[in-house]
């Protein structure tokens, strides 16, 4: 918006004159009342003489002020004093008028100060503020031109939003396509899973909008409640009657027809709780040394043990990855961080060695599948490769997959990327990977530009969760990693994963909009 500086200047000067005129008028009226009360015994001629002397003094003062501004602006016409009556022509008594003239003189100095401020503001402030704002906007614009535009906080915000929306909508179509045969097999309508996924997507979008509007201070205030809710929900997986086991994974709870996977809540809770706890421990490190990190270590250990006890090693690995990023960025001592990584590696190795199924999966990934394993532990991985190979460059067409006809188990869950490659081809599958990279880059760029350590670490944890889990799922499908049972964010069927992933990026959205550079880039 372009302002007319001349009109603004005249308007401010006129406003100053009006305000000063009202102030003087009120002052004269107040003085008139005091004269009327204090001098009730005096004649009316004396009172009128004092009032008229005050009006004359103010009138002369405004004429002097008008002559002062005549060189720069149009002279301002002060209010005309009332014509003196026949009684006002009498000479005034100096002794009586001195006290009355002191108050208008002081008032005139105050009014003149206001008029001077208005004049300076009209002539200088309007142009300087506009020029400084334009310079700031131009500097911000020049900062993000060319290849630097990929770090523009505004572009990153909308890039993340568009990528999440595209993945979520694309996931609805793929869930419907990949689950239709399975639904018919179980005697359910072919669109049953698709409708359920749509409802979860709407619920997740509502959670996204709500989370994006939460002020940053609320996370610090209610972080203990967030962590407690996640820990209690994870503990409910061991309560008889609520516990639900799916394919050996006991990390589910059921409330009637609704099932919930609390581990998804735990991921989001740790993304918020770990940065706050680590930053608080770092501030107390100088006083109590490593004892400051005991509460954080205990809280992380409780959540991790509850997930591992539910036999969900894939989710436990994602949590370990999130914790590793949080501890590294939170300033945890490097020596102890390396020690913790060694301990975590030993624990994972023990969990693998004590499970024959996990050990066979790892060996099949490293050494290939023999004829016996092809019908057992390698069955999913082999048919996933069949699906990817038959898709080619452009795919066989949406809905025309062959592997979804009960050849590839859980085609709409953990192996939905194989159906994407088969039906949509290599190009669309590559575009899906690109969308995850865009989400990760946008969150990473915003995390590096913010001045808040809490926001930076939280954004990095969320990016590690979303992008890391997505890449792990893809690497499992192409047999670069053993089967872990990790869903694909925003795409795989599953209400808990979809809702919590959308809420997580909603939290990231709100934290990204807290960046002051985002306002400057608009």
Name each model-derived stretch:
Residues 243-252, 256, 336-432, 451-458:
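Hydrophobic, glycine- and aromatic-enriched re-entrant/interface helices and adjoining loop segments
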Residues 79-101:
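Compositionally biased, intrinsically disordered low-complexity segments enriched
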Residues 291-296, 319, 340, 365, ...:
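Alpha-helical transmembrane segments of multi-pass membrane proteins, especially transporters
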Residues 206, 224-225, 289-308, 313-353:
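Hydrophobic alpha-helical segments of polytopic membrane proteins
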Residues 317, 322-336, 402-428, 486-499:
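Interfacial segments of multi-pass membrane proteins
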Residues 199-204, 272, 422-443:
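Hydrophobic alpha-helical transmembrane segments
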Residues 2-42, 47-67, 104-167, 173-311, ...:
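Membrane-helix boundary/helix-loop-helix interface segments in multi-pass membrane proteins
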Residues 447-485, 491:
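Loop-to-helix entry and N-terminal half of a specific, functionally important transmembrane alpha helix
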């Amino acid at each position: 918006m372009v302002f007319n500086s001349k009109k603004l200047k005249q308007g401010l000067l006129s406003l100053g004159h009006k305000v000063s005129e009202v102030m003087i008028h009120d002052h004269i009226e107040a003085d008139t009342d005091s004269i009327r009360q204090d001098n009730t015994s005096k004649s009316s001629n004396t009172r009128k003489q004092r009032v008229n002397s005050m009006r004359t003094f103010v009138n002369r003062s405004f004429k002097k002020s008008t002559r002062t501004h005549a060189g720069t602006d149009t002279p301002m016409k002060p209010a005309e004093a009332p014509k003196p009556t026949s009684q006002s022509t009498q000479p005034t008594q100096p002794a009586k008028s001195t006290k009355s003239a002191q108050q208008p003189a002081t008032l005139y100095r105050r009014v003149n100060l206001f008029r001077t401020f208005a004049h300076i503001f009209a002539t200088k402030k309007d142009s300087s503020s506009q020029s400084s704002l334009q310079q700031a906007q131009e500097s911000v614009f020049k900062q993000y031109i060319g290849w630097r535009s990929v770090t523009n906080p505004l572009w990153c915000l909308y890039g993340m939003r568009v990528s999440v929306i595209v993945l979520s909508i694309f996931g609805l179509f793929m869930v419907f396509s990949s689950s239709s045969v399975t639904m018919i097999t179980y005697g359910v309508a072919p669109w049953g899973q698709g409708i359920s996924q749509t409802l979860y997507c709407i619920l997740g979008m509502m959670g996204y909008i709500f989370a994006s509007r939460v002020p940053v201070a609320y996370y610090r205030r209610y972080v203990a409640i967030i962590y407690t809710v996640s820990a209690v929900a994870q503990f409910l997986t061991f309560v008889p009657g609520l516990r639900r086991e799916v394919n050996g994974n006991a990390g589910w709870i059921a409330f009637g027809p609704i099932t919930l996977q609390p581990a998804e809540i735990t991921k989001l809770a740790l993304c918020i709780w770990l940065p706050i706890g680590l930053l608080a421990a770092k501030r107390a490190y100088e006083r109590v040394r490593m004892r400051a990190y005991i509460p954080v270590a205990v809280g992380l250990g409780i959540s991790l043990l509850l997930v591992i006890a539910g036999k969900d090693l894939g989710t436990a690995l994602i949590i370990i990855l999130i914790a590793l990023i949080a501890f590294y960025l939170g300033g945890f001592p490097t020596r102890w961080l390396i020690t913790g990584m060694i301990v975590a590696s030993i624990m994972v190795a023990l969990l693998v060695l004590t499970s024959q199924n996990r050990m066979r999966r790892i060996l099949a990934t490293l050494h290939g599948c023999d004829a016996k394993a092809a019908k057992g532990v390698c069955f999913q991985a082999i048919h996933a490769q069949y699906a990817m190979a038959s898709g080619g460059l452009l795919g066989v067409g949406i809905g025309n997959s062959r592997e979804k006809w009960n050849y590839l188990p859980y085609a709409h869950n953990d192996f939905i990327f194989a159906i994407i490659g088969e039906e949509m081809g290599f190009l669309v599958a590559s575009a899906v990977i690109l969308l995850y990279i865009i989400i990760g880059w946008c969150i990473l760029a915003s995390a590096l530009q913010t001045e808040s350590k809490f926001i930076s670490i939280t954004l990095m944890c969320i990016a590690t969760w979303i992008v890391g889990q997505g890449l792990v799922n893809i690497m499992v499908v192409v047999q670069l990693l053993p089967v872990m049972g990790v869903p694909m964010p925003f795409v795989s069927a599953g209400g808990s994963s979809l809702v919590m992933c959308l809420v997580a990026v909603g939290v990231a959205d709100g934290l990204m909009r807290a960046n002051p550079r985002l306002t400057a880039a608009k």
